[in-house]
């Protein structure tokens, strides 16, 4: 079938409720439904595979979908001059210039290099692992996308930041924020660091280390706790409820015999 029809059919096959379920996440008033696999990302990856594959090698573009990941592979390694480290910064030379021009003029793909930017951009915005090219070799490009959301707080943080801006942060800004979230402080672009600092998106700590702004920390869920009661004590109370319909002071005294005094048991009851 023609590519224009085939790409829609491939996405329809991938985007089934059972194979591409929505991930429901919430924190306070914030509620988002995030697809396991982002349509923009997957379409761009497939079209990149079509545009950059080697047509001198008789091999199909292979798409494998699993519950937690999708892999897309195409014949031929990276185009000349492109590798894992510079894939976002170098302008690649297409293997088929005419095919690439057709895809660009029909609006199916972005101009050279922009498609990869889009894949990284959406993965970071949804707090998913970055596109993984680690299994690529001289004979094939192998690209993997993971479904799992790594950090819900970061997702909420990025949504709020971008939605409040007239000029959106670009993919390099997002990459820097993502590295700081992971505790990576080496090889960061000083110009981007200064930009993010001025916009109060990061904090500069001692020893040239960085952390995300307090706004990010507000989205980190707080662990529920009862002041003055240890987790071990709560576990013992939970075990009591498994064997008793109700718990009296005497029951707790038996449970904590030799561990807590009567006064401490009364104090425990008052705090629960």
Predicted stretch roles:
Residues 1-272:
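C-terminal regulatory or interaction extensions
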């Amino acid at each position: 079938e023609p590519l224009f029809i085939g790409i829609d059919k491939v996405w329809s096959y991938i985007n089934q409720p059972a194979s591409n379920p929505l991930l429901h996440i919430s924190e306070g008033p914030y509620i988002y439904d995030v697809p396991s696999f982002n349509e923009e990302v997957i379409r761009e990856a497939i079209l990149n595979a079509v545009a950059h594959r080697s047509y001198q090698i008789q091999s199909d573009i292979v798409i494998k979908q699993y519950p937690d990941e999708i892999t897309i592979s195409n014949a031929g390694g990276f185009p000349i001059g492109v590798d894992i480290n510079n894939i976002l910064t170098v302008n690649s030379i297409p293997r088929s210039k005419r095919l690439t021009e057709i895809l660009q003029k029909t609006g199916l793909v972005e101009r050279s290099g922009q498609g990869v930017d889009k894949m990284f951009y959406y993965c970071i915005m949804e707090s998913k692992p970055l596109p993984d090219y680690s299994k690529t070799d001289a004979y094939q490009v192998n690209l993997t996308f993971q479904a799992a959301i790594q950090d819900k707080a970061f997702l909420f943080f990025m949504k709020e930041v971008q939605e409040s801006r007239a000029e959106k942060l670009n993919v390099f800004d997002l990459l820097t924020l993502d590295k700081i979230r992971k505790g990576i402080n080496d090889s960061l672009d000083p110009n981007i660091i200064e930009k993010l600092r001025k916009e109060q998106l990061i904090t500069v700590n001692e020893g040239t280390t960085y952390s995300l702004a307090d706004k990010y920390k507000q989205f980190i869920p707080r662990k529920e706790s009862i002041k003055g009661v240890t987790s071990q004590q709560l576990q013992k109370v939970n075990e009591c409820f498994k064997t008793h319909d109700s718990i009296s002071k005497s029951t707790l005294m038996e449970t904590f015999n030799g561990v807590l005094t009567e006064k401490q048991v009364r104090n425990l009851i008052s705090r629960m």
